[in-house]
Regions:
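Conserved alpha/beta-hydrolase
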Residues: 2, 6-28
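Short beta-strand/loop motif that positions the catalytic acidic residue
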Residues: 143, 149-151, 155
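Alpha/beta-hydrolase active-site loop
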Residues: 33-50
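Hydrolase active-site cap/lid region
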Residues: 76-123
Length: 207
C-alpha cells in the first residue's frame, strides 16, 4: 500500500513521507518495548520536524488510530485523513478477545506471548494500560476537514461496523465511508490500491 501511494505521489508531484513505527517492520527496537503513546509521539515528531505544510494523513489499521491522535494534537497541520481499515481504540477489543487464561497470565506476569497472521510477539500489560489512555472514541471529536474511511467487508481483523462506530463520534461535514465488498484487511489488491489513491486525490481536492 505504501509503495502504491508513493508512486501516486511521485506521479502527481506531491510531497510524500512514510515511516514504520518503532518495533515494526525494518524499524529499530522490539514491539514489546513501545506503546501507543510512543508511536503517537513519533508521528507528531515527523509532522513537526520533517513535514512541510498541512498533511493528508494515511493510516492503516493501528496507523489509523495514530492518525486520529495526531490530528487531535496538531489540527492546524493536518488537512485531511484517509483511514485504511482504521482501528482506533482496538485495545479493548484485543483484551476482551483474550482467553481467561491469557488475561490471568497477563495480570500475573505483566506480559503474554501472542500470535497473529503467523507472527509471534510479546504484549505487555503497560501496552494495554497505555492504549486505554489514548482512546479517541470515548467522546465526540470535531473534524471539519476530509475524512475517508476505507473498509473491506472480508476483513476478519477490523470488523465492518467499525467505520460507522467512528463516524458516530467524529463530527464533521466531509466524512465518507467506502465499503469494498471483496476486500480483506490488507487492502492490497489492485482495485483496493486504486480506491486508496482516488480517495487521497479527493481529500487533496477539497483543500
Amino acid at each position: 500500500k505504501a509503495i502504491s501511494v508513493e508512486k501516486y505521489a511521485k506521479k502527481n508531484k506531491l510531497h510524500f513521507i512514510r515511516f514504520e513505527c518503532r518495533g515494526h517492520g525494518k524499524s529499530s527496537g522490539k514491539f514489546e518495548d513501545f506503546t501507543i503513546s510512543d508511536w503517537k509521539k513519533d508521528l507528531i515528531d515527523v509532522i513537526d520536524n520533517i513535514a512541510k505544510g498541512p498533511q493528508i494523513l494515511v493510516g492503516s489499521s493501528m496507523g489509523g488510530w495514530l492518525m486520529f491522535l495526531a490530528a487531535k494534537a496538531r489540527p492546524s497541520k493536518v488537512a485531511g485523513m484517509v483511514g485504511l481499515a482504521a482501528a482506533p481504540d482496538y485495545i479493548d477489543g484485543f483484551y476482551n478477545d483474550l482467553s481467561n487464561k491469557k488475561k490471568e497470565e497477563l495480570n500475573k506476569k505483566g506480559f503474554i506471548k501472542y500470535s497473529s497472521y503467523g507472527f509471534s510477539y510479546i504484549v505487555k500489560k503497560k501496552y494495554i494500560i497505555d492504549g486505554r489512555k489514548n482512546k479517541i472514541l470515548n467522546k465526540e471529536f470535531k473534524w471539519n476537514k476530509p475524512l475517508i474511511l476505507i473498509q473491506g467487508l472480508k476483513d476478519n481483523v477490523v470488523k465492518s461496523y467499525i467505520p460507522e462506530k467512528i463516524v458516530k463520534k467524529v463530527k464533521g461535514n466531509q466524512i465518507q465511508i467506502k465499503l469494498l465488498k471483496n476486500s480483506d484487511h490488507r487492502l492490497s489488491e489492485p482495485f483496493d490500491l486504486k480506491v486508496i489513491n482516488e480517495c487521497i486525490a479527493s481529500a487533496i481536492k477539497k483543500n
